[in-house]
């Protein structure tokens, strides 16, 4: 039986890789990236619900079951997917291809009893029990392997996903773009350079073949007859030939370098250009290290297709030309060379799978190690404040040691292959020497002819030796092509062939109508949400963390599409507008402020690149950022460190607010935009918002309720639903969820025993009602 094993690309790909194995078993080829999207894989991985949903979408009939050890031996459809817990304590999926099966219920029970008796007997005798029941599994993180049922049950949770293809299941291969074609499209504009590289290679080949005749002329013509005058001429001619060869070789190398650079620019920038067009869910479900390692994949492909591919093509041409010449010179010696070549080619095929497996492991572990380093460095403040440097270093060391072990195994495989290749070349080289010299001694061949054959034969055998040496690089390129193609085939967030309306300004009401949404296959983040933001009005979203407030802002920014329902602006469906124009028309301040390694001036005007310094200063004053910027050494020309390190959280938020105010949009979305500010600065900013921006529409997400009490409408969210709506005063009168949140923030708590009457805790400060605005103020 052929087992269709697929290795996972990244740490969260195990479920997708397992489903890909099952699909391949039934003659359907589909990419891991496509399966990730279908099952809703995110940074936490994939749950069983998502995997079952994807399998059903592909045309499988599914059943998620829990089995004990006895029932696992019963007959059921394989391959299936099993949930296991890794040695590190992480949930993981593997594919079960084959196992010990006992169909009869009675025989199965007797089998279990016999095993239990043998187990006890071995324990009494101090022997190790050997389980004869087996399981063949495809572990996407490791390998295809056959293990005992005892070993399997050490990690097996008992959960299986059984799958059977229905009439709706379609075999075949998912249509994929060709990375080779993409690369050839990049090479075509550089066809002149490529032609020069090939031409120089052809000239070098001709010169090389001609040079091999030097020894023949020397041994057969000059030495036997003592032609001293001819000796000088021959040496002079071949010296000129060798110098010419060196110069052409140098020119060829420069052409290849220049060709590499010309291809490098569109390839690398093309990759990142495509990545920037991908939807937010692509980034939300992948670690940064996993994305950046694809950049290395692009570099590997470029290296193979420029220098290596050209060399291999020319080496093959050279082998064919010299093969014909060698055959005409001496068929016997040529047959030995052919045998050497065939053995070398066989060696390449023998080591193909080991190299493929080790390269896949290397690339996967490289992504894990990169992600670990990036996370550790990004969270260095958290690491240090918790004195967890040693623990983080241990985690990094653990992943690095895994990388070293994989590298060691790779080196062992390369060494073994190289040793076998050397032995083949050496032994058959000695055989060639013996046969050739015997022919010279028997007068069947001249000494010069033998030496010419020996020199020329290297042009025939060397290409194959080069191919053996390049096998690791070629395998890496093949895997890189597969990994990179899956990213390049990932659909952009908007169909580039469709015409969209460009939004200039948001003029009109914004309406959410029965909108539902979920991240991947998780529980719904929003359930049938409906509300309207009237033009020029201020609407607030409040509620506990995870209630769906930020999700609404992301849908409005078109980071994600609603699962159901519609969002409209001025009566026009938001889907009709291009993503870029919608985002340009909205001034958004996110929870997590991202600053770049640029000047403060450049960081603020990222929302309006053409803005002047005076306009940037005006926006900074609105955000109450001008004063702290003015105190910096170079003021607005001060260069920020990576991610704005060196600035406080409040200073970062003020710069983010300045960006938004500079945009001067008709709609502002403020998502916890003042959470790091002191009360004085926060009040100053909201005073400006409610007065200077009174005619602008606003969606304000806030936990600090005092900032949104003057909003025209407050929406209270809980578990993805709007549970209350109204003004501040109306919601307080209802004494519902909003009243609870407000009371908690004022230091007032409900007495659960006495009902809803609010009481102050013993340690609470005295609460005084301000007669002017009715806000509870704690002194």
Model-flagged regions — what are they?
Residues 215-216, 256, 274-321, 378, ...:
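Juxtamembrane loop-to-helix connectors within ABC transporter transmembrane domains
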Residues 198, 202-213, 243-250, 301-304, ...:
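Hydrophobic alpha-helical transmembrane bundles that constitute the permease/transmembrane domains
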Residues 194-248, 255, 327-332, 443-447:
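Transmembrane helix-loop-helix hairpins at lipid-water interfaces of multipass membrane proteins
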Residues 273-290, 361-409, 481, 499-501, ...:
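Loop segments that connect adjacent transmembrane helices in multi-pass transporters
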Residues 236-245, 249, 311-361, 431-445, ...:
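Transmembrane helices of ABC transporter permease
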Residues 117, 123, 497, 503-779:
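ABC-type nucleotide-binding domain
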Residues 1-210, 224, 228-233, 252, ...:
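Membrane-integrated ABC transporters
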Residues 365, 369, 381-388, 412, ...:
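Cytosolic ends of transmembrane helices, especially the final helix of ABC transmembrane type-1 domains
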């Amino acid at each position: 039986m052929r087992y269709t094993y697929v290795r996972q690309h990244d740490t969260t790909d195990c479920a997708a890789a397992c489903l890909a194995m099952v699909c391949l078993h039934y003659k359907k080829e589909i990419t891991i990236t496509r399966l990730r999207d279908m099952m809703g894989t995110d940074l936490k991985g994939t749950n069983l619900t998502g995997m079952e949903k994807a399998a059903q979408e592909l045309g499988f009939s599914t059943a998620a079951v829990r089995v004990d050890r006895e029932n696992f031996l019963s007959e059921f459809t394989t391959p299936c997917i099993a949930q296991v817990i890794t040695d590190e304590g992480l949930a993981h999926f593997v594919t079960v291809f084959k196992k010990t099966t006992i169909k009869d219920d009675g025989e199965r029970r007797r089998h279990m009893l016999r095993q239990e008796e043998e187990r006890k007997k071995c324990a009494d005798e101090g022997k190790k029990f050997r389980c004869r029941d087996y399981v063949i599994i495809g572990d996407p993180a490791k390998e295809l392997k056959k293990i005992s049922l005892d070993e399997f049950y050490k990690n097996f949770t008992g959960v299986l996903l059984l799958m059977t293809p229905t009439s709706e299941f379609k075999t075949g291969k998912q249509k994929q773009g060709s990375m080779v074609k993409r690369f050839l499209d990049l090479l075509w504009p550089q066809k002149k350079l490529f032609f020069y590289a090939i031409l120089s290679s052809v000239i070098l080949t001709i010169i090389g073949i001609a040079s091999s005749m030097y020894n023949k002329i020397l041994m057969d013509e000059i030495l036997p007859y003592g032609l001293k005058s001819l000796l000088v001429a021959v040496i002079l001619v071949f010296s000129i030939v060798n110098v010419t060869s060196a110069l052409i070789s140098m020119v060829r190398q420069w052409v290849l370098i220049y060709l590499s650079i010309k291809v490098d620019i569109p390839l690398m920038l093309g990759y990142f250009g495509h990545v920037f067009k991908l939807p937010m869910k692509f980034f939300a479900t992948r670690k940064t290290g996993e994305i950046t390692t694809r950049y290395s994949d692009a570099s590997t492909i470029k290296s193979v297709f420029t220098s290596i591919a050209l060399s291999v093509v020319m080496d093959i041409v050279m082998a064919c030309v010299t093969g014909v010449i060698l055959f005409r010179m001496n068929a016997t010696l040529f047959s030995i060379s052919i045998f050497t070549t065939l053995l070398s080619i066989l060696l390449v095929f023998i080591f193909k799978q080991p190299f493929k497996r080790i390269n896949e492991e290397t690339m996967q572990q490289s992504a894990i190690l990169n992600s670990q380093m990036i996370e550790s460095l990004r969270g260095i403040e958290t690491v240090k404040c918790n004195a967890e440097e040693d623990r983080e270093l241990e985690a990094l060391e653990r992943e690095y040691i895994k990388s070293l072990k994989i590298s060691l195994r790779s080196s062992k495989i390369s060494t073994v292959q190289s040793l076998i290749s050397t032995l083949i070349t050496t032994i058959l080289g000695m055989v060639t020497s013996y046969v050739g010299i015997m022919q010279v001694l028997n007068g069947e061949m001249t000494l010069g002819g033998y030496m010419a054959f020996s020199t020329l034969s290297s042009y025939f055998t060397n290409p194959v030796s080069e191919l053996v040496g390049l096998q690791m690089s070629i395998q890496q390129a093949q895997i890189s092509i597969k990994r990179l193609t899956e990213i390049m085939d990932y659909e952009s967030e908007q169909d580039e062939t469709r015409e969209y309306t460009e939004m200039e300004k948001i003029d009109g009401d914004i309406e959410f109508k029965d909108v539902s949404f979920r991240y991947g296959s998780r529980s719904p983040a929003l359930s049938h949400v409906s509300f309207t933001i009237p033009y020029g009005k201020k609407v607030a979203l409040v509620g506990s963390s995870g209630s769906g407030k930020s999700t609404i802002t992301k849908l409005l920014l078109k980071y994600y599409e609603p699962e159901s329902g519609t969002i409209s602006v001025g009566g026009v469906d938001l889907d009709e507008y291009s993503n870029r124009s919608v985002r340009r028309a909205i001034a958004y301040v996110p929870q997590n402020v991202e600053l770049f390694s640029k000047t403060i001036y450049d960081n603020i005007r990222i929302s309006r690149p053409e803005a002047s310094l005076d306009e940037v200063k005006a926006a900074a004053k609105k955000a109450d950022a001008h004063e702290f910027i003015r105190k910096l050494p170079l003021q607005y020309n001060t260069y920020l460190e990576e991610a704005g390190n060196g600035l406080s959280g409040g200073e970062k938020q003020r710069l983010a607010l300045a960006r938004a105010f500079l945009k001067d949009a008709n709609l502002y979305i403020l998502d916890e935009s003042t959470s790091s500010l002191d009360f004085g600065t926060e009040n100053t900013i909201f005073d400006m918002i409610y007065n200077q921006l009174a005619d602008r529409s606003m969606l304000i997400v806030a936990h600090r309720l005092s900032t949104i009490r003057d909003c025209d409408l407050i929406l209270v969210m809980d578990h993805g639903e709007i549970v209350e709506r109204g003004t501040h005063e109306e919601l307080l009168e209802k004494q519902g969820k909003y009243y609870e949140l407000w009371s908690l923030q004022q230091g007032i708590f409900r007495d659960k025993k006495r009902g809803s009457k609010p009481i102050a805790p013993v340690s609470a400060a005295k609460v005084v009602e301000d007669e002017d605005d009715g806000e509870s103020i704690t002194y």
